[in-house]
Amino acid sequence: QKPALLTTTLWDFPSQQYGDETQGDKNYRGATPAYIIRNLLHRYTRPKELVVDPMAGSGTTLDVARELNRRALGYDVNVTRKDIFHCDARKLPLEDEKAAFVFLDPPYSTHVHYSDDPRCIGKLSALTPDYYKAMELVLDEVKRILRPGRHMALYVSDSFQKGKPFCPIGFELFQRLSRRFEPVDIICVTRRNTTLDKGNYHKAAVEGNYFLRGFNYLFIMKKA
């Protein structure tokens, strides 16, 4: 049985994947919950339309799109499977206004080592302007390839590392998105990962007087 579409701006999923099929790789660090892609594509695309993921990771977007009879293209500097093209999201090999929908799940600063490729944005700290400059180039490419009147979504978390300043990545990227697209809505997605299940992490957060990341932003935007 397929999951029902969600109708509020608070999304909480029991797992990374749904059903008996595999969407992406559940063991891939930072894998996007397949439920998110399913909800977005049901709302903002139609069968046979082209869905693009410039930071495809383990291919969750591609699998969900094809399951829903959408065409899909995925790009990444760290290729994990044959149907993902080796490419920097700042320079996509796609013609203008070809995509009906674009999904982005970028690195949230330097928390996860994704690749040894020097072009990997995950090597850039969100404490520096370089991260945001790189993401602006990615957003420019998304705007270029997206058809007018169609939607894109960006899934991201803020960043906090003990002993370092808090990085409001979500707010920073939303400002940059708003200069390129029309805001449609903001969804709060509950984070479910092994870190949040470990009691010692919660004990450390209390003792250190800081908070663990409990949610991700899902920004939904429209190209004028």
Region locations from a protein language model:
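Class I S-adenosyl-L-methionine-dependent methyltransferase catalytic core
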Residues: Q1-A224
